[in-house]
A protein has these predicted regions:
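Short hydrophobic alpha-helical module
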Residues: 145, 172-173, 197-201
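Nucleotide/phosphate-binding catalytic cleft detector across ATP-hydrolyzing
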Residues: 1-159, 175-189, 209-216
Length: 216
């Protein structure tokens, strides 16, 4: 099975022959009784993945980041659908600035891994999945255009990828990856700043309620 999985700081996105899906890159070390997210059992521990109130995967070092691997393995297990065993050919990404330093280490940490995991929407609905990650390709985030639209990278080109918690900027010269930058910015950070400003200015506890009142 060929899969592209992008474990972003905000959301985890997965694409395969079946189509695509995404969930929030959050992990809780407990099981929620009522939840629209996913429940997994991995190495004897139970987790809730994708819950609004969970902790986001924010570590720069993806190799040793527990949340990164839990989100990655959850995405693969969910993509397996009705299959219980699969051999995975994986494409994933790293923040542009850390690509050269972490690429080989990440490939080494994932390639050949045999993973057993249970996944479901409740503890009572868990299904056993087992997969082997046979091959791993790692791209710098924001470099997908190399595959989807290489003709646009003529001459000197900058590609900007605005994520939830980071902005990746990649400089290309005639399709060659030259300089990467990763800025700790993003739409979630912007949204939090706007919410803070509105709360401060209008002295409201819930921005959504205030907006709804103004609309009427």
């Amino acid at each position: 099975m060929k899969l592209g999985v992008d474990v972003g700081y905000s959301h985890t996105k997965c694409v395969g022959a079946f189509g695509e899906f995404k969930f929030k890159s959050t992990v809780l070390d407990e099981v929620q009784d009522v939840s629209s997210s996913l429940v997994i059992e991995f190495e004897g521990e139970m987790y809730t993945v994708g819950e609004d109130e969970g902790l986001y995967a924010t570590e720069i070092d993806k190799i040793n980041d527990k949340s990164f691997k839990l989100c990655l393995y959850t995405a693969i297990a969910r993509a397996m659908r009705n299959s219980n065993e699969e051999i995975i050919q994986l494409v994933t990404g790293l923040p542009a600035q850390y690509f050269k330093e972490q690429k080989d280490k990440l490939i080494k940490s994932l390639k050949g891994q045999q993973v057993s995991i249970k996944i479901g929407t409740t503890p009572d609905s868990l299904e056993f999945k087992e997969f082997i990650i046979k091959d791993v390709i790692v791209f710098p985030q924001s470099a997908g255009v190399l595959v989807t639209d290489p003709k646009s990278l003529v001459g000197d080109t900058c590609v900007v990828d605005i994520g939830g918690f980071t902005v990746d900027v990649s400089y290309f010269s005639n399709r060659k990856f030259k300089k990467p930058y990763t800025l700790e910015l993003g739409m979630n950070i912007l949204a939090a700043s706007i919410v803070g400003m509105i709360k401060s200015k209008y002295q409201v506890s819930y921005v959504y309620q205030y907006i709804m009142r103004k609309k009427h």
